[in-house]
Each structure stands twice: as C-alpha cells, then as structure tokens.
Amino acid sequence: MAGEKMVRDISGVYARLFDHRAVLQAECKYMLREFEGKRNDRELERLRESEQKIRQVQEEIPKCITESVKLKDLLEELKVAREKCHEILVKEEQDLFKERREEIFIESKKNWETFIGEIAEEEKRIEEEFEQSAEKLRARYGVQLVRNPKEPDDKGELQPQEIA
C-alpha cells in the first residue's frame, strides 16, 4: 500500500511536470476563441481580398503574355523602320555630296575654260611678239625665217633662209 501510494504520488508529480496536454488544450481553445472572436472578420476579409487579387492576376497574365508577343513584333517593326530611316539619311547625305561634287565639277570646268582662254591669249601674245622680233631680225640681217612643218598640224621649227 505504501508502495502503491508512492507510485500514485510519483505518477501525479510526473503528470504535473511532464504531461502538459490539458494546459495545451486549454491554451489552444483560448487562442481559437480569441482568433475567432476578435480577428475572424479582419482575417476573413484579408483572405477574400487576397483571393480576389489572385483571380485578377490570373486573368491578366494571358493578356500580358499576348501583349508581350505584340511588343516583340512591334520592336522588330521599329528596328526595320529605324534601318530604313538610316538608309534614307545616308542617301540624302550622298545626294548632298553628289550635288557638292557636281558644283565643284562645274566650277572646275569654268576655271579650266578660263585657264585655256588665258593660255590661248598668252600664246597669241607670244606669237605676236615673235613675229615682231622676226620682223626686226629680217629687217636688220636680211634673213627670212620660215617654218618647216614636219606634220600638217605641227607648226614646225623655224629655219633661217637667206633672202635673195
């Protein structure tokens, strides 16, 4: 009996020290009542809002995917348009250079014609001076200078001949 009592006391002490099921159950019931009483409506509203947002996101995802594909196509079209604009700018630039080259060519042609005209005038002046000098020499020495053409177009070299 004494041993039995001792076992009961030990098991009672053991139950109080190590078996907390009753305390935990009471604590759980308290938390549940507290949660349901005070937070039930707020948490339920938050859950409903979250569910609604999730549905909206699920509805928007396919739209976003199709728009993404459209954006890729648009990006490709923009790249093509940019390349065409670049080609047009290059052509315009080349046309400007072409116009400038034509202007330079026309100016050079005018300068060349002016130069050729000046050379022709200088040649005439030199010819006249030569003829005057030849006249003076003929008068002074009695020698006549004549041209001996080697070719029909060539004026040839001057050869002295005595005047008879």
From Swiss-Prot:
One of its GO terms (cellular component) is BLOC-1 complex. PANTHER family: BIOGENESIS OF LYSOSOME-RELATED ORGANELLES COMPLEX 1 SUBUNIT 5. InterPro entries: Bloc1s5 (IPR017243). Keywords: Coiled coil. Pfam families: Muted. Residues 36-91 form a coiled coil. It comes from Nematostella vectensis (Starlet sea anemone). Component of the BLOC-1 complex, a complex that is required for normal biogenesis of lysosome-related organelles (LRO). May play a role in intracellular vesicle trafficking. Belongs to the BLOC1S5 family. This is Biogenesis of lysosome-related organelles complex 1 subunit 5. Component of the biogenesis of lysosome-related organelles complex 1 (BLOC-1).
